[in-house]
Amino acid sequence: MMRLKQLNEMSASEFIHLLGGVFENSSWVAERAEPNRPYSSFQSLYNKMVEIVETASDNEQLKLIQMHPHLGTNVKITDFSQEEQKHAGLNELTKDEQNHLILLNQKYKDKFGFPFVMAVRGKIKQEIFRTIKERLQNNHQTEFKQALEEIKKIAMFRLQEIFREGENNSMTKHKERVMYYGKGDVFAYRTYLKPLTGVRTIPESPFSGRDHILFGVNVKISVGGTKLLTSFTKGDNSLVVATDSMKNFIQKHLASYTGTTIEGFLEYVATSFLKKYSHIEKISLIGEEIPFETTFAVKNGNRAASELVFKKSRNEYATAYLNMVRNEDNTLNITEQQSGLAGLQLIKVSGNSFVGFIRDEYTTLPEDSNRPLFVYLNIKWKYKNTEDSFGTNPENYVAAEQIRDIATSVFHETETLSIQHLIYLIGRRILERFPQLQEVYFESQNHTWDKIVEEIPESEGKVYTEPRPPYGFQCFTVTQEDLPHENILMFSDEPDHKGALK
């Protein structure tokens, strides 16, 4: 291993400087381990350092234990200890928890004469509180031995951290590898979330806000970082956040979320997760709305919307995506954010044509100057200012319901020459209504029905069936540069002199 080779070849002072903190503020362990180089493996190095501690005098062992800081302390501690306590959430204690831990630490030290030591990597604060209470019941000899055992565990984690960094540097210096893991289908439902109000209204849509009596979301989370490499290459789980923990994290944070949008919730989860787990370098979240529709009930003899009963929708739903990374200075940065509307299916029974396309020996599709058009649409949009997507300033927030209503309105108004033309016009209208958006992206599919009965006596109707399985699709991005006005063919409310719709 490259790092081990470097370790064996570096000077004595470099060796001691690198490993002096493996045992808390006790560089004498590294000093005594240095002359035994070269080491053949990580394990042989660790075994030698443990042997040095085990064969040290009682006084040296006591001083080693006393070098460890109290858990949850506010005084300056080593970088190793700071990171370990941060992983366990000890930097986020409430005032009451902080005072309780101080009291337990003092009781422990008063009884045994040295601080409570515990390898907190992978532990949660509740487990730490429980353990210190249990160990307060032990005698001095038992706790002295237990403290040394915990110190050995801590040393193992710290050595792994040092070797992991070296291995990560050597394995990723040529090309950044794909490396992430996560949890999908994290369903969370919240009743009585803060309502979304103050949204700017537009002519195409009656939408003005959401009451959020019932808020449902399906989240997919993935995380990554160079420190996770050995979880793949060596099965080392010491820095692995279990995906079940991710699920719990997301669901419980919906309870403390004070915002009003899926986009804002994803940002809240991402920020909280990276603050909680400082070794995670990047996080991606996808949120899909689980929509519920209003039902009606008779109240005092009148029909009115029910505030108790809702119907799960099988129709279109809002989506959001967010990617956040940790910078070298430990600040967090959103590298990508996108809002969306998925699963919108629209049928327009007339006023659609498809003519003038290439005809050759492969063409069997007839031209049609007035056909039904059934389209599936996924629409995604990006803001010029990412923070506008969170809904904290509702005047700048663009709701999926408004995007839906613009799409249906433009579809109704426009003499549709093709799906390509339709999505372009919808995108332009969206950007005209919402100049705070940077671009709108479309994924569309053509699911126009096949005609079965051409003419029905004394009726304008026809009979259709589902199309054959292959379907056409289109992808297109509309940007602010597309906004200069052009002539758009639209229906008027009145027929022309020939009886045809303009």
Swiss-Prot record:
User: Which PROSITE patterns did the record assign?
Assistant: URICASE
Positions of urate binding: T243, D244, F354, R371, I419, Q420, N446
Residues the record marks as active site:
H68 (proton donor), K183 (charge relay system), K194 (charge relay system), T243 (charge relay system)
Is Chloroplast given among the entry's keywords?
A: no
Gene3D superfamilies given for it? Answer: Oxo-4-hydroxy-4-carboxy-5-ureidoimidazoline decarboxylase, Urate Oxidase
GO biological process assignments: allantoin metabolic process; purine nucleobase metabolic process; urate catabolic process
> Which NCBIfam families would you find in this protein's record?
UHCUDC, urate_oxi
Q: What protein name does the entry list? A: Uric acid degradation bifunctional protein
Organism encoding this protein: Bacillus sp. (strain TB-90)
